[in-house]
């Protein structure tokens, strides 16, 4: 079955070019499905206008929404004329991430696409507070799109956690690989690589325990990771030459390998309770994300429950 048949694109209000919408159309052309172009807007100055009656305030708000809707329609004009099914929705809300997630739940959207801003000098992607909230709390996969064309022959790199003995991590690893393979098959038969990072011996252990042999320890850790990677790749009939078990910190290993492979996208798993973490615990994943220079797809476990609740109020 084709994936991502009900996409939600978060529109960037500050620029005419919309890379996330472009990527959604690119996916639509290959796997079908429909697209909702969604923009939450809020202007505090309208709320401060005490001289206006509630009706006048509502009318002003509605005027801004209408203007923005027409602006998005103009950005999407070429796609709409080509018959791409794009629904446009603009809402007034002062917490963008909340209303985006509420829209995802209410509309049963199976993928969220949003533009990732790029630091001009560093080439690294900059994530806004709204981006982080979505990556941590959105129940559907979130695709952060970099403002660049998909690289010719761009590969997909899946970051997996080979160290954990927790069963939910194994299930999440398998979900990441399965969904990426499925997507890759439908989009240009993209080549899929897997990566796992393993830690080096802490120096202080070697100092405090003179009889401790770091090389034996490192070999044992590497061996465990290689066995775990072998079990995972064999489950999906993946060739050994596209799997990578690398020594070092995930936030160094994964971005470096992504750059070396000229990956178009890195796929990460996240476990909601601890923030981002599939290949990592705590903030490690967030450091990985901070170092990436390509698209990012973040996927949650099947049992993930978002802390964001549906808004009962009808604006």
From Swiss-Prot:
Q: Does the keyword Amino-acid biosynthesis apply?
A: no
Annotated compartments: Cytoplasm
Q: What does this protein do?
A: Required for resistance to DNA-damaging agents.
Supply the PANTHER family for this chain: UNIVERSAL STRESS PROTEIN E
The record's InterPro entries line, in alphabetical order, gives: UspA
Protein's name according to its UniProt entry: Universal stress protein E
The family assignment reads: Belongs to the universal stress protein A family.
The source organism is: Salmonella typhi
* Source species taxonomy: Bacteria, Pseudomonadati, Pseudomonadota, Gammaproteobacteria, Enterobacterales
Task: Please report a single Pfam family linked to this protein.
Answer: Usp
Q: Which UniProt keywords apply?
A: Cytoplasm
* Membrane-spanning residues: none
Q: Name one GO cellular component term.
A: cytoplasm
Q: Does the keyword ATP-binding apply?
A: no
């Amino acid at each position: 079955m084709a994936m991502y048949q009900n996409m939600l694109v978060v529109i960037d209000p500050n620029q005419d070019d919309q890379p996330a919408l472009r990527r959604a159309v690119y996916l639509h052309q290959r796997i079908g499905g429909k697209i909702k172009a969604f923009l939450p807007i809020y202007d505090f100055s309208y709320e401060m206008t005490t001289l206006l009656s509630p009706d006048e305030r509502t009318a002003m708000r509605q005027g801004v929404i209408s203007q923005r809707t027409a602006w998005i329609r103009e950005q999407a004009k070429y796609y709409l004329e080509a018959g791409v099914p794009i629904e446009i929705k603009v809402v007034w809300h002062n917490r963008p991430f909340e209303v985006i997630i509420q829209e995802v739940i209410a509309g049963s959207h199976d993928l969220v696409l949003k533009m990732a801003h790029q630091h001009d000098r560093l080439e690294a992607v900059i994530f806004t507070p709204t981006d982080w909230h979505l990556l941590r709390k959105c129940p559907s996969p979130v695709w952060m799109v970099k403002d660049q064309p998909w690289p010719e022959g761009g590969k997909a790199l899946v970051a997996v956690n080979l160290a954990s003995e927790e069963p939910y991590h194994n299930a999440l690893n398998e979900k990441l690989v399965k969904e990426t393979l499925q997507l890759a098959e439908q989009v240009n038969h993209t080549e899929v690589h897997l990566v796992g990072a393993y830690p080096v011996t802490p120096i202080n252990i070697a100092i405090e325990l003179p009889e401790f042999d770091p090389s034996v320890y490192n070999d044992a850790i590497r061996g465990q990771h290689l066995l775990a990677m072998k079990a995972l790749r064999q489950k999906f009939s993946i060739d050994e030459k596209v799997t990578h078990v690398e020594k070092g910190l995930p936030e160094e290993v994964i971005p470096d390998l992504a750059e070396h492979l000229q990956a178009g996208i890195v796929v990460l798993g996240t476990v909601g309770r601890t923030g981002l973490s599939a290949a990592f615990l705590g903030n490690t994943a967030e450091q990985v994300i901070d170092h990436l220079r390509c698209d990012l797809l973040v996927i949650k476990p099947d049992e993930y429950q978002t802390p964001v609740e549906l808004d009962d109020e009808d604006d």
